[in-house]
Every structure is written in structure tokens, then in C-alpha cells.
């Protein structure tokens, strides 16, 4: 993977990371179009590890929300109570991804480069988003995130382990299925991305090192490629993250997912 390919793929990942589309799915499609060997071990690692840039974007832009929860501002809770509730719910929502991610790791790895599967999932996801607002938004009036709701959303998030399925779409729909408002569901999805993507990145790095693939990081320009991808990703990813809590997913945005789904499906189905 050369530097031009790295830059293009990183920009695509940054632009799609915080939208209800599959950033990984779009990356795989673009990698295929650019002639990148998507079965290559380093490319698979790059596809996951580059999302570390998204983590940095969220933490840098919303660090106050991580250290000064909204409930403190509104006076609903004391500082330490609000901090405990915020992180405890994130932990509960992350547990399913940890358990199922480890259990189905082989399936995820073997299908990460499956362009046909990715294409189909993008198409199905795009079509589903056209109707999910009508299906789940009726009666959505809750803003309180209970531990039970956090756990259910965490399990629904695991559907995104299928390459081409959007993590943010899964969690937002999961929240709305629990009668949370779109805003409340999107906010939890936004913050849940941090521990989830951080865990996925750590797992990928661990697998590379423990299976003797750690040398891949220092092979040729691989390490520089990872650094370049993460840095390039920061700008578009940061722009998306900056408006993430203010321009929450709505029906007009679904067009982006449908477009991506059709694009990916047409390409994938011909391979």
C-alpha cells in the first residue's frame, strides 16, 4: 500500500466514521478499487488500527464530557455520582463487544476482506435506514439511559462485527428500539465508540505481536503508513466528530448510506 492509497483510504475512513454508515465497509470497497490486497495481513491490521485516530478526535474535542458529565452541569447529580454513572454505562455497553468479539474473532478476520459480503451489508444497511426512523422513532421519548438499555444497545452493537454493518447505525437503532430519543441514542453511540474502537485496536496490535507478526509494523514503510493514516484521518475525522453531537443523524442523511450501499453492492456483486 503506497502513500497515495494510504491518504485516500484514511480520508474515506475519517469522512464516514461518525455517520451511520460502515466506515470499515467503505474502506474495504475503496481498498479494492485502488488495487490494494485486502487479504494482506498488514492491510487488515491497518483497516482496524487506523480507527485509533477517531478515538483521539473524540477525546480531544469532547474531553470535557469525559471529565465533566452533562448531569453535573444540569445539577441532577454530584460530580462523582455523574462520573460513575457515565463510565459504568459505557463499561456495560462495551462488555458484549469484548465477549462476542473474542468469541467470533476468527469469523471477523476471515470475512474482513469479503467484498461481496461488505457490498450486500452496505445495500441492506442503506435500505434499512430508510425505514428505521418510522419503525423505531414512534414513541421515542426517553432520555435516561439505564444499565439494562446500555447492555441491550451493547449487544445490538455487536451486529456491526459483520463487515459492512455500521457500528453507529446499530447502536443508534438499538437506542431507539429502547424508546430513547434520537439525540440520546446518538450521544451514547458517539461515546461508546471510544472504548469499543480502543479495544479493537489493542486486540489487533496484540494479535500482530503475539503471533509473530509484530515485525510487520517495522517492515518497509508499514509503521510510517500507520502513522500517516492516523494523522491524515484526524482532520476529516475531527470535522465529523466536531459536529457529531450537534448534527445528529436524521432521515436526510440516510441518502449517504444508500449511496454508499449501492456503490459497494454493485462493485462487490461483480467480484
Predicted regions: what is each one?
Residues 1-271:
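Multi-pass membrane proteins that catalyze or facilitate reactions on polyprenyl-/lipid-phosphate substrates
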